[in-house]
Amino acid sequence: TTLFRSLISCLYLSVGAQTPQPIKQFLRKPYMEGASFSLIVKEVNSGETVFAYDTIRQLTPASVMKTVTTATALEILGEDYRFPTTLEYDGSIENGLLKGNLYIKGSGDPSLGSAHFAPDHKRFLQEWISALKKVGIHKIQGAVIADESIFDTEGTSLKWVGEDMGSYYGAGSYGICVFDNLYKLGLQTGAPGTRPKLKGTEPELSGIHFHNYLTTQQVSSDSSFIVGAPFATDRYLYGIVPANREWYPLKGDIPDPTLFLADYLTRQLEHEGITVGESPSCFRILREAGRWQPGKRTEIVTTYSPTLREIVEVTNHVSHNLFADALIKTIGLRYTP
């Protein structure tokens, strides 16, 4: 980082000048052997090129493109923009019984429950439960339904490589996201050459079937993959993990974060003594079954995300793929015909 800052500080010289010493030092580093390097720096207001180095070389921009996405989001949405997630109901409340369904209305917020905003990232759950009790709901006749209809169901691109499907860094972006759309799978590993035991997930996932093809070796870190398609309940585990660990975590993507949140909230409600009569569901499932019924709903409480400025800071600092995908989809909504 220090070298990079020194490099940038030396760039305010004419384009025709010799290559600055910091760049020469950078290019002589062992990790740059065989690598390609290109750089251009422009003055923001005038557009004048301050420094250029091998600018005709074609390079893959990779996550540098996140800066374009986040800058565009700040320009269009504004740095104080916040994503709303609303708890709503239809039907009526009679003597503590909700004669209808409870809805989670999403707006594409990628930061709901995100660990990057700890320690208060799970506070929204208690806020929702408290709000339900405040309006007098102690029993739900219908179901908890997540409404992710603001975005389509293509949370991941069909052009992504197969090994990214199921990985935490390849988590899909949907109208409702939660907990960074990732889970941790705990492993208990034994002697080298053995298969590790699966110790459950955090958060707890319902209905997921893991096919375990992992093996242990005497290594310090894993080289493994969790592979699986969006919405699919099967996940395949491949690769190697360190031997003799009482608990070793692997991270994967929540296959259907929208349905997961409906299920998760249902379990939290029942833990708090608020019973739910029907199984959790979501817009995608109900629409495919021809049972989606749009209609009038009553707002109970709205949870707002951190500011866009804060979300952008996380996006660029940790190179958060999910956040970037959600931002570009949100920008696109502003230009939907």
Feature annotation, model-predicted:
Residues T1-L3:
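Short, small-residue-biased leader/transition segments that mark boundaries at the very start
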Residues S6-A17:
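Hydrophobic h-region of N-terminal signal peptides that target proteins for export
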Residues V15-Q58, P84, Q126, S130-G136:
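Beta-lactamase-like hydrolase cores
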Residues T19, P61, M65, L261, ...:
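Hydrophobic (often cysteine-bearing) scaffold residues that line and stabilize catalytic clefts
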Residues Q25-L27, I76-P337:
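Conserved serine DD-peptidase/penicillin-binding transpeptidase domain
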Residues E43-N45, S63, L74, G108:
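Short glycine-rich, polar/acidic loop-and-turn segments at beta strand-coil junctions
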Residues A52-T72, I76:
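Short active-site loop at a secondary-structure junction
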